[in-house]
Amino acid sequence: MFTYATKSEKEETNSVSLSGEIVTEPTFSHEVFGESFFDVKLKVPRLSQTFDLLPLTVSERLTCNFPLFVGQQISLRGQLRSFNKQVDNKSRLLLSVFVRELLPYDSALSPNDVQLDGFLCKQPVFRTTPFNREICDLLLAVNRAYGKSDYIPAIAWGRNARFVKFLPVGQEVKIIGRLQSREYQKKISEVETETKTAY
């Protein structure tokens, strides 16, 4: 769902709620002011009986009293963050859910809910898929504390795609949706391909 945001509606600009199963052991990611952060993958079910494998970034402060292990069912709240990383001498925009709260698994919660309030930083790109579905690619700048911003790609479908395709750069919008993963094959030579994941 896409809506125009107004100042009176201003609340949390970046909110993620997920429930699923831990499928990788926590691996060290980085350290900030002596605090260690770890990368974990969460398997989140879809209604279509498939699932998404979503990247999490978790502070050691959270796992002290809530250790994570493969096969564990959890719920969480956090924010969708972006960062640039050098891969093969190219800068890539990577996404991860920055976990702010770990919770016991709760089947009553929505397993995958994302709410963003930000600004369009590129002109929306409207297109039709090979399956004749209308979609619109967006890039949203979501502000956070200390003057930083996260740059979040999003896809609007159907009626929402037609609604947002003419919005101007700089337009503030509120997005409610899901975080999904999609594997694709990237050709790296005439005979070799590499499997990558987009979010």
Where are the predicted features?
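OB-fold and OB-like single-stranded nucleic-acid-recognition modules
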Residues: 1-199
